[in-house]
Amino acid sequence: MGSIGNGRNGSEVGIQIPAMGNKEVLERPAIPRWPRLGVVMVATRAVALVMAVLSMALMISAKQRGSLKIFGIEIPLYANWSFSDSLEYLVGMSAVSAAYCLAQLLLTAHKAVKNAPVVQSRNYAWLLFTGDQIFAYAMMSAGSAAAAVANLNRTGIRHTALPNFCKPLPRFCDLSAASIACAFLSCIFLAASAVIDVIWLSNM
């Protein structure tokens, strides 16, 4: 080749363009994964599920026959959870809450298999928060209604001749009390899940 005006050989003149290789771009993920917080969320829902199932199972098994003497007259008694609307409400809400917690756990397991974030968007976090709040209040309402009936059975009615029904029916009263306790524990863990949802929302 001929020379250029500056006296340099044309083969020596050129523009060097840096090679564009595979550039690794480190971007901060838009959605925090927070493995520890995800584990806590799964744990609270699992415990809430277990407590709801126990509450339902214990109340369904609350049945007993006995007898009671009033003014020297022996009266046969039969206690069954299905005789009370409040106890039926507790069983129903425990079943629905257990189904809700189980569905959330299955969704979380599906995301874990796909290595996806536990909470994928703010809308999903709000949905979780709303659901956890609703079922926490529902379990608290059901537990309170059932507790009123259980307390009436244990203490009787004041200023009347009705006695303590738990003396001739101890198994029924004990199972009912255990079921109500599990319902309140399920409420507490659902409320804890709602708090975790708020933490997710505040960091998204």
From Swiss-Prot:
Q: Which residues lie on this side of the membrane: Cytoplasmic?
A: 1-39, 110-124, 201-204
**Glycosylated residues (UniProt):** 80, 153
- Per its UniProt record, what InterPro entries does this chain match? CASP/CASPL, CASP_dom
Q: What is its main location?
A: membrane
An example of a Pfam family matching this protein is CASP_dom
Membrane topology reported for the UniProt record? Multi-pass membrane protein
Q: Where are the transmembrane segments?
A: 40-60, 89-109, 125-145, 180-200
Q: What does the UniProt keyword field contain?
A: Cell membrane, Glycoprotein, Membrane, Transmembrane, Transmembrane helix
Entry's Gene Ontology cellular component terms: plasma membrane
Q: Which domain of life is it from?
A: Eukaryota
Name the NCBIfam families for this protein. Answer: A_tha_TIGR01569 (TIGR01569)
User: What family is it from?
Assistant: Belongs to the Casparian strip membrane proteins (CASP) family.
- Could you give the subunit structure recorded for this chain? Homodimer and heterodimers.
> What name appears for this protein in its UniProt entry?
CASP-like protein 3A1
